[in-house]
């Protein structure tokens, strides 16, 4: 288990939308994310990021996921399921790619609200610089993914 005390703070971005009457259809999209389905937007960009990761000695873009309901510990491309609860419509994935920090993406439906949350804990100055350099691209990609899931 890695000691997260060596990391400084958490940077968070949250998207939120009203999905009244569509909670189940939105959850079905969340449950199916990754693998053959892709990421609803920018899958080629995710594959490119995976190629860069492989060059840096990481795992690369491991396309795939189980063909059943997700469980804790399952692989979803280069993410790992670290929290899933179908009854709460909750899914949390942790990135396994090479990064100057730790990153998670959480999808959750509470009542009639759908949330997509990105959490990044940078490691050192390079982690903070990395976050701010990629933030515009990540913001665009994650916004488009969010819109596609809500649609």
Question: What are these language model-derived features?
Answer:
Residues 1-60:
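Hydrophobic ligand-binding cavity/cleft-lining segments
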Residues 26-30, 81, 116, 149:
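Hydrophobic pocket/interface hotspot
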Residues 94-139:
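Beta-strand/loop substructures that line and gate deep hydrophobic ligand-binding cavities in soluble
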Residues 83-85, 111:
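A residue-level detector for short acidic-glycine micro-motifs
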Residues 10-18, 90, 104, 113-115:
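Intrinsic-disorder/low-complexity, polar/charged segments enriched in Ser/Thr/Lys/Arg/Asp/Glu/Gln
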């Amino acid at each position: 288990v890695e000691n997260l005390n060596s990391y400084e703070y958490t940077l968070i971005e949250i998207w939120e939308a009203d999905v009244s009457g569509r909670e189940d259809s939105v959850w079905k999209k969340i449950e199916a994310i990754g693998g053959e389905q892709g990421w609803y937007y920018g899958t080629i960009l995710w594959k490119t990021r995976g190629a860069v990761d492989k060059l840096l000695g990481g795992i690369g873009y491991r396309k795939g996921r189980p063909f059943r309901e997700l469980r804790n510990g399952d692989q979803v491309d280069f993410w790992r399921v670290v929290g899933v609860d179908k009854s709460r419509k909750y899914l949390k994935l942790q990135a396994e790619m090479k990064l100057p920090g730790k990153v998670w993406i959480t999808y959750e439906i509470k009542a009639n609200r759908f949330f997509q949350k990105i959490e990044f804990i940078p490691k050192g100055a390079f982690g903070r610089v990395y976050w701010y350099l990629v933030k515009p691209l990540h913001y665009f990609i994650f916004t488009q993914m969010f819109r596609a899931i809500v649609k």
